[in-house]
């Protein structure tokens, strides 16, 4: 194993475990068994929003620092990767189609995909805005110190 693999595995594993537990917990809190699988829809849309925000906040021009790299692995790949679930979404769609609810399956798929795209875009916009605010604040602090 290379050094980067050895150092990258722990943050992904810890984040993935935490994200999976959060998803599992939400599955017990939100209603289930309906045409709309609220827990899956919620985790995927919230996950898209947070991933858009996180990646926009972490992807500033320049070389990625070790701290940023670890944060991306822990929070993005690990936490949000474990929190969101494409496989459950696909299984729920297949069950709806197999039981004859094709129209509902298509509606559920469309709502999930559109809401996810909008959430990711909103997260990226928020990340950009927060990044500009942070850099403006940092410039003000530096200018005030001179």
Regions found by a protein language model. Give the residues of each.
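Membrane-interface helix-loop junctions in multi-pass transporters/channels
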Residues: 1-146
């Amino acid at each position: 194993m290379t050094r980067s693999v050895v150092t990258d595995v722990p943050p992904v594993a810890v984040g993935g475990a935490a994200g999976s537990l959060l998803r599992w917990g939400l599955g017990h809190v939100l209603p289930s068994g309906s045409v709309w699988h609220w827990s899956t829809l919620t985790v995927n849309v919230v996950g898209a929003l947070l991933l858009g925000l996180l990646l926009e906040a972490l992807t500033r021009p320049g070389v990625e620092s070790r701290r940023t790299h670890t944060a991306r692995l822990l929070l993005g790949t690990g936490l949000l990767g474990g929190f969101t679930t494409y496989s459950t979404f696909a299984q729920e769609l297949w069950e709806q189609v197999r039981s004859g609810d094709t129209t509902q399956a298509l509606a559920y798929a469309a709502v999930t995909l559109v809401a996810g795209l909008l959430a990711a875009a909103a997260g990226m916009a928020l990340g950009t805005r927060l990044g500009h605010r942070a850099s403006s604040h940092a410039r003000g602090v530096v200018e005030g110190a001179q």
